[in-house]
Regions:
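Alpha-helical segment of the N-proximal tetratricopeptide repeat
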Residues: 51-82, 94
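Catalytic glycan-binding domains that act on GlcNAc-containing polysaccharides
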Residues: 1-30, 34-51, 82-285
Length: 285
């Protein structure tokens, strides 16, 4: 009964993310949908409802409303005088402005910090923050790849957000490249020939190969999202060594026992992203 109450409270106040998913699944309300996205979902996936900036600055809000994000960003920078954002409200505004000028890498980082620092009295910011945290960047590129590989678009978006924050040119210190952070050796195996860094940074090619690898992992683990996403990060060989007889009964325990801290966090982030992309989650204040 105590566990059920905890799940219910989580679902009301934190319906998005990994723990929102696990709460909904444990209560039998809804689960992560791993069915293929319907054909022709690209246009629908990119149609994120417009939201006012609500910065408290009438001129800035007007520029945003008129579809001039660059001018709005420059106005914000000028008025801030180089000062960093001081609280969740500032982080939300600046993060959204950065997104508006194509800087998802920094913008999403600021929005995540805003969510972490959010105070109870700022609860009214949650719907705006939740939407901004889950942009559907490159959906027109990911949707055909998802359709070809029979994957849900929400899962690919969840991986891309965590891997690259939707930044095609990003490269990791380990050598992974592009939107879905493919290792050159893995990409060459999937493509049947070596690819240059520039080729791997091309969104369509990266999306196609990344979706192909993600599908291979999903098939290998017979549709288990936890092992699939862990394998995408740590490799299927490592994940094979972490299997336990009761993993399907106690998936939350299995995740917490993942010996690689990076992979443990990665699994929660990616599947939490996918859950939030699957359907808009609105927390209750």
């Amino acid at each position: 009964e105590e566990a059920t109450l905890t799940w219910k409270q989580l679902l009301v106040h934190h319906p998005g993310g990994y723990y929102g998913w696990r709460a909904a699944a444990r209560l039998g309300k809804e689960d992560l949908n791993l069915q293929p996205s319907p054909a022709g979902t690209a246009e629908e996936a990119t149609s994120t409802p417009w939201q006012p900036l609500a910065s408290g600055d009438a001129a800035l809000d007007q520029l945003w409303r008129l579809g001039q994000p660059t001018e709005a960003w420059e106005t914000w920078r000028l008025r801030r005088g180089g000062l960093p954002p001081k609280d969740s409200g500032d982080l939300l505004v600046e993060g959204r402005l950065r997104q508006g000028v194509g800087d998802d890498w920094t913008g999403l980082g600021q929005l995540e910090k805003a969510a972490f620092l959010l105070k109870p009295e700022q609860c009214s910011l949650l719907p705006q923050l939740e939407q901004a945290l889950h942009p559907r960047r490159f959906a027109e590129t990911f949707a055909p790849a998802a359709e070809q590989q029979q994957l849900p678009l929400s899962l690919i978006l969840g991986v891309a957000k965590q891997e690259s924050r939707f930044t095609p040119a990003v490269q990791s210190s380990a050598g992974a490249v592009g939107l879905l952070q493919l290792m050159p050796a893995t990409a060459a195996e999937l493509a049947g020939n070596p690819l240059t860094t520039e080729e791997l940074q091309e969104p369509k090619r990266n999306a196609g190969l990344g979706a192909q690898y993600l599908k291979a992992m999903l098939d290998q683990w017979k549709g288990d999202p936890l092992a699939t996403v862990a394998s995408y990060n740590a490799g299927p060989g490592a994940v094979q060594g972490w299997q336990t007889p009761d993993r399907s009964r106690f998936p939350e325990v299995w995740v917490e026992a993942i010996p690689y801290p990076e992979t443990r966090i990665y699994v929660k982030k990616v599947l939490g992203n996918a859950w939030s992309y699957q359907q808009e989650r609105r927390p209750a204040c």
